[in-house]
Amino acid sequence: MLNQILKDLFDSDPEIKKMAAKAILKDADEPAQVFSSILKEADRPTATVVYDVLFDAEGDFSSIFRAATGDDDAQVRNRAIRYLFRRGMLLPQDGISWLEDSDPFVRRRVISYLFWMNDRTSLGAVVRLSNTDPDPMVRKDCLRLISIWGTKSEVPHLIKALEDPSHMVRTQAVHALKRLTGEDFGEPLGASPEEFEWIVAKWQGWWEIMGERT
């Protein structure tokens, strides 16, 4: 019977695939082992069905989803990381590693989870990305996290972010500076271009003065 179910799992019809995956989940003695073996040779449609079925299934399939964090498909990696976080199995060192993912949406997902985990060991990696990540949304999210976790020692990176080519990143840098330093040189949201540049210049001038005092 298992052979027929496995055959159905590789059927071209997505519904047949899904029913076969659910049958394995229900009837196999060790479904995690069975699915792990299947995924080693599964094509993309079959693997997608397996991940879909396992994502909300009872039981622990963390080993399968941890392996999926190395998948070529960014959507699969993103969902695998989501599964691990939801199950409480995402470790800070995992998050630091996945901040190097090639897909910006995956990196943003990881940053959001690190925020909820409230683990400061990843702050250094987040600070670095705030100035170097190629995606402006990632840089913005990093600055937001720094504003919550960071200290005044992160201020130099925030000052550097004031020169970011993205306006939203620069705006987030101002908010982070206000939160970490207690200083306030104006609200960037709603400011005219001229007013915004004045706010940035005030922060840069303040930083120069701070540097002269140390």
Tell where the protein language model's regions lie, with residue ranges.
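Repeat-mediated protein-protein interaction surfaces in helical alpha-solenoids
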Residues: 1-2, 93
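Structural detector for internal amphipathic alpha-helices that build alpha-solenoid repeat scaffolds
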Residues: 7, 15-29, 37, 45-59, ...
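Function-determining sites in protein domains
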Residues: 166
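Terminal, low-structured helical/coil segments at or just beyond the last alpha-helical repeat
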Residues: 186-214
